[in-house]
């Protein structure tokens, strides 16, 4: 089943990005976003250190049946990276809530990956954002999260931000490579690293890590049992960043949540198993948009 996706080799997946053509000015930040297609609304949320580019091939495919919204969190991708602006999960959850209002979306489908999961959950549980369904893909939602590298950066963010560009690039590529189980092509690595390679991007990369804090998931974890919208938990079996046992625990905590584990995929499931993920999401979104 091709679900209108580019069903070619993995090497050709994610080699070209998309320029987000719209901007929302929000609390001094410029938030890049765009909309593709027509139909039931689907909002796709990225994580760290990623951007909406990770979701672009899926958005392009789903646009045949859905209105797909892509956006970059401030501090990421094509959105502003002002050093004076906080980029923590608390701010991003407030922004997502306001974005849904700006788009006049009463209850869209939401698909979230990594940090995007915590952002979507905070918007729903703390700020009243309503969803028709919520798909959580290898998400940050349960403590503990954050690696020893995160803690090292948090304690020395200024030092890391001042590294020579070549040293930063090497560290960045090594860090990102660990998120893929099958390995990244040079073109895929370029899509992921490019936003962080400028002088502004280098500072922004370490700033967002320094502002990572488990309290943002602690504040909502006890509320997962109150979630009433349909939830799908999808995980790469070989996720080295957030182990699959977190998926099992998260699915247990959310009433009625479904769990799907995809073999041969790591944290970057969009790269490692793009067709399998596309089929899973297409089935999920279609079933909840056109219930029998």
Which positions does each model-derived feature cover?
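Conserved HGGG/HGGXW glycine-rich cap/lid loop of the alpha/beta-hydrolase fold
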Residues: 34-78
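Conserved alpha/beta-hydrolase catalytic His-Asp/Glu region
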Residues: 144-147, 165-226
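Active-site loop/oxyanion-hole signature of alpha/beta-hydrolase fold enzymes
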Residues: 27, 36, 69-112, 279
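Flexible "cap/lid" loop of the alpha/beta hydrolase fold
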Residues: 125, 131-163
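Short beta-strand/loop motif that positions the catalytic acidic residue
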Residues: 227, 233-235
């Amino acid at each position: 089943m091709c679900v209108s996706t580019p069903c070619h080799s993995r090497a050709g997946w994610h080699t070209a990005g998309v320029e987000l053509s719209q901007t929302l000015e929000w609390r001094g930040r410029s938030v890049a976003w765009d909309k593709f297609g027509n139909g039931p609304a689907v909002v796709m949320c990225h994580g760290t250190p990623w951007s909406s580019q990770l979701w672009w091939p899926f958005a392009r495919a789903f646009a045949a049946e859905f209105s797909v919204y892509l956006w970059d969190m401030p501090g990421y991708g094509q959105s502003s990276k002002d050093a004076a602006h906080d980029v923590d999960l608390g701010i991003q959850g407030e922004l997502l809530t306001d974005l849904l209002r700006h788009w006049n979306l009463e209850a869209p489908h939401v698909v979230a990956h990594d940090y995007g999961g915590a952002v979507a959950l905070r918007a729903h549980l703390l700020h009243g954002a309503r969803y028709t369904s919520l798909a959580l893909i290898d998400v940050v939602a349960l403590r503990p999260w954050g690696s020893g590298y995160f803690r090292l950066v948090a304690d020395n963010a200024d030092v890391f931000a001042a590294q020579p560009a070549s040293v930063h690039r090497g560290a960045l590529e090594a860090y990102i490579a660990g998120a893929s189980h099958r390995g990244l092509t040079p073109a895929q690595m370029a899509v992921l690293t490019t936003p962080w390679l400028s002088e502004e991007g280098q500072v922004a990369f370490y700033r967002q890590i320094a502002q990572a804090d488990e309290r943002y998931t602690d504040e909502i974890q006890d509320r997962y049992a109150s979630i009433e919208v349909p939830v799908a938990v999808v995980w790469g079996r070989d996720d080295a960043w957030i182990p699959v046992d977190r998926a099992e625990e998260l699915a247990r905590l959310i009433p009625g949540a479904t769990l799907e584990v995809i073999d041969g995929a790591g944290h970057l499931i969009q790269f490692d198993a793009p067709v399998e993920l596309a089929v899973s999401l297409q089935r999920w979104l279609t079933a909840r948009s056109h219930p029998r």
